[in-house]
Amino acid sequence: MNISFFGGVQEVGRSCFVLEANGRKIMIDAGLKIGGKPEEKAPLFPLEQASSIDCIIITHAHIDHTGWLPFLAKNGFLGKIFATKPTRDIMHLLLSDAAAIAKENKEKFYSTKDIDRTMELVQELEYDAETQIMQGIMLTFLKSGHILGAAQALLEMNGKNILFTSDFNNRDTNLLDAAEFPNKKIDVLFMESTYSGKKDLLPSLKNASKELADTVKKALKRHGKILIPVFAVGRGQEIMFVLENYIRSGYLQGLTIFVDGMIGRANKICRHNVVYLRAEIPNRILRADDDPFKSPFIKTPKTKNKKDVFKEKNAVILATSGMLSGGPSIFYLQKLIGEKKNCIILVGYQAPESLGRKLLDGAKEIEIRKKKFLVKAEIKNIHFSGHADFNGLLGFAIKVNAEKIFLVHGEKQKIPELQQEIEKKLGKTVAVPALLEKIELE
């Protein structure tokens, strides 16, 4: 039994591992990297070998875990793709949007036909339902708390329990319960390490929410507009709920929330899959006057040039994409970045080389579609992350206490900080795989 790493190690993005056991090849996630160099966007697995993969396990719908699937389907992969029902629904939306953005940027990409071919291969699995996916190989999805439908993948084979956490959040959010803890002894743990630096300590939801409301209030006082670039699923709804609560309380009186890009369609998917969200959300929907997805304070732009948004006196704009890699958030950024009264609030992880990361790093000038813009607007970073922070990752690894621990999905320069701390606490070696490395697990 061995595992090979074709992406998503010592980097964030293009997650793609291949586990070989019992004469079978199982791929765990098949993503693309957002931002960065074109040659580093795809996993390093040879596409001409797509037909050699027996099945694929998809942990959640984000493009850095799913964006490569249509390329595999296009090149001969015919096996099953295992995912939760919400992941299947969201995946179709995000893959279609990625294809549209690529077309806009004149990149070679997959077609609608390739997406349809991919979706036909998806087999939905429920959480906590142990399923035989191959002879002698069992799969159980555990809740990961990352986004709607996201899962940890627990594989049982050859007498071993192997857990892939994928992206997980060990704290409750407005939408989701915290990640489940496995109820079986784990032999091999593959744990994400997005926030693996000792300084990566994230605020509580309560503190982040208050900071967001205060930042919005200050910008409105100086007659500015606020842009919050968000992922369509997860952060989009999280921020929407927070702002809507502050409007209802009277703290952000007169505020209008504009949602643009895929957020509206993502909201419909969330509402359709409401049984997978925290229990209080279905209860709110049952009370007709308190449906968070149909709030009177939330609007979509009515005109193509967004004039109605800019005419609104008190406006917050939630727009995709969350790292400013495409979508309408780019349009709003160009309009707002050049005035001091405006505010750009970054609320999620920003990948190295992404436009969002450049703003976080204090860039004085940015380039959008070959045009330069001076950065004069206030740039604010308020964490509403769907990931565990340094302490959350450390605590999870200690509690699981697996025989073998591998850190994946993290920034190369930060991972050693978490690695050393886990080794110190548990007194065992923690491995950090390299790209194209193959490791024996028995």
Question: Where does each model-flagged region fall?
Answer:
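Short acidic, glycine/proline-enriched helix-loop-strand junctions
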Residues: 414-439
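His/Asp/Glu-rich metal-coordinating catalytic cores
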Residues: 1-57, 62-66, 71-238, 244-251, ...
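Generic long, charged, amphipathic alpha-helical segments
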Residues: 367-395
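Short, solvent-exposed amphipathic alpha-helical segments in soluble enzyme
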Residues: 20-22, 156-158, 179-183, 242-248, ...
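Hard-cation-handling environments
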Residues: 212-347, 351-352, 408
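A general structural motif
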Residues: 201, 205-209, 293-305, 323-325, ...
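Proline-aspartate-enriched helix->loop->beta-strand connector
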Residues: 402-403
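Redox- and metal-dependent alpha/beta enzyme cores, enriched for Fe-S-associated oxidoreductases
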Residues: 338-374
